[in-house]
Amino acid sequence: MSSLSTVAGFLVSRLRQIGIFIALVAIVVLFQILTDGTLLEPRNVTSIVVQNAYILILAIGMVMIIIAGHIDLSVGSVVALVGAVSGVFAVNWGWPWWASIIASLVVGGLIGAWQGFWVAYVGIPAFIVTLAGMLTFRGLAQIVLDNRPITPFPDGYVAVGAGFLPDPSDGTSYLEWVTVTLGVLAAVFLVAQQLRERRARVKLNLEDEPFAWFITKLAFIAVLVLGITYLLASYQGTPIVLVILAVLVLVYTAVMNRSIFGRHIYARGGNLNAAQLSGINTKRVDFLLFVNMGFLAALAGIAFTARSNSALPGAGNGFELDAIAAVFIGGAAVTGGIGTVIGAMIGGLIMGVLNNGMSLLGLGTEYQSLIKGLVLLLAVAFDVFNKSRGSKSAT
């Protein structure tokens, strides 16, 4: 009984972090029932991954921006502009697809540097700079495209957003074994990482996670990864964009948790004056954050354009709102200083499953917008409630 009460106390203390996991699982179970099992069919799971990858890529950069106390309203327009530019490179000018992608990423970084300069060194609030960017880059995208789509793109380019890892069995086996191998390796890696981190915390007497909960968490991680692996391997295997996303999540999680730059981002968002007094070059942090956001927005634009096989003037409409919603649903604080890459990914998946589930049920876009708005409001209200409860208990 004492073990159960210990676990319960731990869960209550970590309600903010664990709550989004519970919400995601509950939403998946709900729509799996309402759609008579269609939600978790292999084809639909693959569709959810491919359709939401570019939003998740944007959410990685956006959570870093929001942790630092800023916001970026221009990412949807950057998606459109980079798609337009890459269309000119790859289709109109006939560049190799890989050269078009590299050049487009450079363009995205330059866009981020432009906005970062105004925010970091001129001192204009990010809201205003990126609002201006949203209008400017949308207009530039329409000018570059002359308000007409550019299509089709080279096969290599399209594969980035719509392709799958090669299947050596040519579809003759029941499960695509490359995906199975990657899934098993991913499960082993994640479990080993959790064990290593727990051992380090125990050695420093910092471990407060009950062992029973730790084992339950490990089992859940393994079952989740292997379950997704089975569903992907039952259809066409691993989408290339999922591999890109997984690498980004690993890299940026390490940056935020283990690097000096990551600690500077949290410090800048938690208390700007204290960060400056401690010697952190906050202007440099802000500048690099927007360069990074431009790079990731360009990558998201490439993924979206590749999936569409077309550069569209209206591409990216509303993407900034989806990315911001994913970050706040994933547990980031409105005031900055709090948030995680993993939380943003879970928030993005919640939005993606909601979109997909409501589409399967035949709900119109008006109802989808209504429900997503309410979910976002409830997520932020839950964050405010947790903060007020914490401050009351502290006093």
Task: Report each predicted region and the residues it spans.
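Inter-helical junctions in multi-pass inner-membrane proteins, predominant
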Residues: 37-47, 146, 229-242, 253-257, ...
